[in-house]
């Protein structure tokens, strides 16, 4: 068996996630494509595919149980994190992956084609200039910006009254929380357990007040 698949299976076994055979193969395929493209396009500072499984794949997958709704947007998606792993985990949900760099969008289109992922739309745009036809249940960000910048730049993206912001962070970002704009409030903070990852991970869930 592919060593990446062996490692992925071992990591998943340390979580409570349910991941099908097809999803596991797609996740491994994604890492292989990321590794291949990374050599030419410098999409991530993580060079070792085994390390990518922990720092990129599992770090994204642990958000999976906290997705409520049908439509999500991953802002500043980069090479598709956390959007691609989450889209693989949730084929019944729609994901828009937005990034301003053309090389990243080209990579995402290749991933979608090669892995036959049909619930992802890659968009090349600055997030503050993106004008969707309708709002999203969740606005995801990972290593994108401060939470204040994120909610200010993305405040037009969540569904009115129902949509939330989902910010994936390291240590609990209490300093950032104190700087949030008046209209925004923290509704929950989830401590995330990522197998074999050093350091803390937290998911901060935010929404518009009222």
From Swiss-Prot:
PANTHER family: S-ADENOSYL-L-METHIONINE-DEPENDENT METHYLTRANSFERASES SUPERFAMILY PROTEIN. It is an enzyme of class 2 (transferase). It comes from Vibrio cholerae serotype O1 (strain ATCC 39315 / El Tor Inaba N16961). It holds the Pfam family GidB. One of its GO terms (cellular component) is cytosol. S-adenosyl-L-methionine binds at residues 76, 81, 127-128, 142. GO terms for molecular function: rRNA (guanine-N7-)-methyltransferase activity. This is Ribosomal RNA small subunit methyltransferase G. Keywords: Cytoplasm, Methyltransferase, rRNA processing, S-adenosyl-L-methionine, Transferase. It comes from the Bacteria. Belongs to the methyltransferase superfamily. RNA methyltransferase RsmG family.
């Amino acid at each position: 068996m592919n060593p990446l698949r062996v490692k992925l299976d071992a990591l998943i076994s340390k979580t409570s996630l349910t991941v099908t055979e097809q999803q596991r193969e797609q996740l491994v395929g994604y890492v292989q494509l990321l590794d291949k493209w990374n050599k030419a396009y410098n999409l991530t500072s993580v060079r070792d595919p085994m390390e990518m499984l922990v720092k990129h794949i599992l770090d994204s997958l642990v958000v999976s149980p906290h997705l409520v709704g049908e439509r999500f947007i991953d802002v500043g998606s980069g090479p598709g994190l956390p959007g691609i792993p989450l889209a693989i985990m949730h084929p019944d949900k729609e994901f828009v992956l937005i990034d301003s760099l053309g090389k990243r969008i080209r990579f995402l289109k290749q991933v979608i084609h090669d892995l036959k992922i049909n619930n992802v739309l890659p968009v090349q745009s600055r997030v503050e200039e993106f004008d969707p036809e309708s709002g999203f249940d969740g606005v995801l960000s990972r290593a994108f910006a401060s939470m204040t910048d994120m909610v200010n730049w993305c405040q037009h993206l969540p569904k009115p009254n129902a949509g939330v912001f989902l910010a994936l962070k390291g240590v609990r970002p209490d300093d950032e929380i104190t700087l949030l704009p008046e209209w925004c409030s923290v509704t929950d903070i989830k401590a995330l357990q990522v197998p074999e990852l050093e350091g803390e991970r937290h998911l901060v869930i935010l929404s518009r007040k009222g």
